[in-house]
Amino acid sequence: MSLLTEVETPTRNGWECKCSDSSDPLVIAASIIGILHLILWILDRLFFKCIYRRLKYGLKRGPSTEGVPESMREEYRQEQQNAVDVDDGHFVNIELE
């Protein structure tokens, strides 16, 4: 006898499990853990950028600029922007014939 015929049998309404002893606490706990794991995995995949950025940097927005002259603030902003700008000189264009 195959495993399929031992566990599941076709009925008029669809597939039904013969071993419907779902009152076992271990089965209930495993089902709850499985459902929670699936929900957390889906949320992780949907929001992974937000979640890991928050964990990495926390709620910090950057160093405090309180008491710093405006000219120094602008210089700092410019340095930060230059650090993230892409330098096209580092890329090599390869043309296939």
Curated annotation (Swiss-Prot):
Q: Where is this site: Essential for channel activity, possibly by being protonated during channel activation, and by forming the channel gate and the selective filter?
A: 37
The segments annotated as topological domain Virion surface are: 1-22
Q: Site (Seems to be involved in pH gating): which residue positions?
A: 41
Q: How does it sit in the membrane?
A: Single-pass type III membrane protein
- Report whether Transcription shows up as a keyword of the record: no
Q: Please give the chief subcellular localization of this protein.
A: virion
Q: Give me the ranges of the annotated region Disordered.
A: 61-80
Please give the sites of covalent lipid attachment annotated as S-palmitoyl cysteine. Answer: 50
The GO annotation for biological process reads: protein complex oligomerization; symbiont genome entry into host cell via pore formation in plasma membrane; symbiont-mediated suppression of host autophagy
Q: Which residues cross the membrane?
A: 23-43
Topological domains (Intravirion): residue ranges? 44-97
Q: Which UniProt keywords apply?
A: Disulfide bond, Host cell membrane, Host membrane, Host-virus interaction, Hydrogen ion transport, Inhibition of host autophagy by virus, Ion channel, Ion transport, Lipoprotein, Membrane, Palmitate, Phosphoprotein, Signal-anchor, Transmembrane, Transmembrane helix, Transport, Viral ion channel, Virion
The cellular location(s) given in this protein's UniProt record come to: Virion membrane; Host apical cell membrane
Spell out the activity regulation: The M2 protein from most influenza A strains is inhibited by amantadine and rimantadine, resulting in viral uncoating incapacity. Emergence of amantadine-resistant variants is usually rapid.
Cellular component GO terms, alphabetically? host cell plasma membrane; membrane; virion membrane
Positions of modified residues (Phosphoserine) = 64
Extract the Pfam families matched here. Answer: Flu_M2 (PF00599)
Q: Which GO terms describe its molecular function?
A: monoatomic ion channel activity; proton transmembrane transporter activity
Q: Which InterPro entries match?
A: Flu_M2
Query: Belongs to which family?
Result: Belongs to the influenza viruses matrix protein M2 family.
Free-text comment on this protein's domains from its UniProt entry = Cytoplasmic tail plays an important role in virion assembly and morphogenesis.
What this protein is reported to do is described as: Forms a proton-selective ion channel that is necessary for the efficient release of the viral genome during virus entry. After attaching to the cell surface, the virion enters the cell by endocytosis. Acidification of the endosome triggers M2 ion channel activity.
Q: What more is known? A: When the channel is activated, one or more imidazole moieties of His-37 probably become bi-protonated.
| Assembly and interaction partners | Homotetramer; composed of two disulfide-linked dimers held together by non-covalent interactions. May interact with matrix protein 1.
Q: What is this protein called?
A: Matrix protein 2
Q: Which organism is it from?
A: Influenza A virus (strain A/Duck/Hokkaido/8/1980 H3N8)
Q: Which gene encodes it?
A: M
